[in-house]
Design a protein with these regions (language model features):
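Acidic/polar-rich alpha-helix caps and helix-coil junctions
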Residues: 1-215
Length: 215
């Protein structure tokens, strides 16, 4: 991973025998690091143990989220008839991120498409939202709202072999393919976890309240 901090590029190599590898105190368990949210004026290499951490107000809502909310609402309400209105808003987000427009990307897909069903557009919007708003505190709520929490969370966490010292070991290279490995077991044992229980204190206050199913 390369971080641009205070005008300098910092290369964070994650193999075991490297400074940011598993042997260090704060190493990544997956071999991945998150650049999003790191202020470019921060400096992890400045003298002293703590470095320089620049704090700033966390954006609770962004224009991109409003575009995504609008796109999702249009698709659910109007279906395919709304897609000519939805795509320009998704393209605004893509343009800002420096990636090709939606239809241009799909024209180069393995199975190219120029139009989508309501269900297909829903999947596209879900994916665009997951990518654009990643690490901003939305994902947990989105998968519950869409009722796909078990589908998304009932699977193991995969990453690179952080014990590997060579490139081949780290990326678990087999032939010409890198093979991520399981780094953590994760399961979603029951659908009840998609919803919060009502506090017993609140139920005691009002006996007419009915506890959430499963709790």
């Amino acid at each position: 991973s390369i971080y641009e901090l205070r005008g300098a590029n910092i290369l964070c190599e994650m193999r075991f025998n490297k400074p940011y590898g598993k042997q260090s105190q704060d190493a990544s368990s997956t071999g991945y690091l998150v650049k999003k949210g790191v202020h470019p004026s921060s400096d992890c290499q400045q003298s002293g143990q703590t470095g320089l951490l620049v704090k700033y107000p966390f954006p609770l809502i962004r224009l991109a989220e409003l575009y995504l909310n609008y796109a999702e609402a249009l698709n659910e309400y109007e279906g395919e008839a709304s897609h000519s209105k939805i795509i320009p808003y998704l393209d605004k987000i893509r343009e800002r991120a420096g990636i090709p427009a939606l239809l241009k990307s799909w024209s180069k897909a393995r199975y190219p498409k120029t139009s989508f069903t309501k269900d297909e557009m829903r999947e596209i919007i879900h994916r665009e939202r997951m990518i654009e708003l990643s690490f901003e505190g939305h994902r947990m709520w989105d998968v519950r709202r869409w009722k796909i929490a078990r589908q998304e969370f009932d699977q193991d966490v995969k990453g690179w072999d952080v014990s590997g010292q060579s490139v081949e070991e780290f990326y678990n290279v087999s032939g010409d393919m890198a093979q991520p490995q399981i780094v953590a077991d994760r399961n979603f044992p029951n659908e009840k976890y998609a919803l919060w229980p009502i506090s017993i204190t609140e139920i005691q206050k009002n006996r007419n309240l009915v506890q959430t199913d499963g709790w």
